[in-house]
Amino acid sequence: MLFFLWFVSQGIIAQSYSVDTSYTVMSTYDKLIKKYPFIKIAQATKGVNDVKIENIVYYKEKDRALHLDAFFNKKQKNNPAVIMIHGGGWRSGNKNQMQVLAKEITSKGYSCFAIEYRLSPEAKYPQGIYDVKNAIKFVKDNAKRFHVDPDKIAVLGCSSGGQMAALIGTTNEDLIFEDTKYKSKSSSRVQAIIDIDGILAFKHPESAEGEMASLWLDGTYEQNPENWKQASALHHANENTPPTLFINSSFERFHAGRDDMIAILNQNKIYNQVETIPYSPHSFWFFQPWLEKTVEYSTKFLERVFK
């Protein structure tokens, strides 16, 4: 009886934060299948020496633990690492949604990490940014374990995760975006950004952000304009921004601010690349035939930057 009560209490603790489960691969498939009847949910091909370790705790505060899934080749050492951030409008989604993409990129000679971070029902901006930057430090601190070269780190995100990836990459070692409670010998600096259909500016002529952005940014633009500005990668892009790849769908609003950021990168002679997948929907990376192109564009870019 005592064991049962302890088990139940642990379950209550584990669910003491809000979870929005509305954004899933299957729900996205159901929305798209009528317009795109040829699509198939993407499946991964596992390399013979590839290893997956799930639910590694990278940070814990009181009863709340944050996890990551690690994917790496046990025969190869000092691989470039790819930190992966799922989408879901900053309020839904989970790290499992990055597993197929992680496995595919791992099979090409990289170590990949799918990150759990706190979403807007649980924590407002910039807490999720702190979480991913803490995960980067954790990966660097454990570089030998994960077969990682700590000086070759890319951050990749999809949709809202793409927005976060761009913000993380454009705020390298900016103390405003560092969690002072997290103790590490490593920095959160990254050397490359892959933004997959994520906006670069919240308030922009091309942007159409509304309720979900307001929930994450703790208010509408009129209520909290500073957060809307500070959370925009375009606001931070400068001569220190790392090489950047933009992979986009055919929907323009999901790359709001991209062309302005490219102008800054070009002005500073920073390598950047744009790949648009024609006639594709948002969330194209979940499905074939588009996952294959996503992997191809990502790995060719990473090879150019790191190898």
Protein language model regions, located:
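Alpha/beta-hydrolase superfamily serine-hydrolase fold, recognizing
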Residues: Q15-K307
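Bacterial Sec-dependent N-terminal signal peptides
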Residues: M1-T21
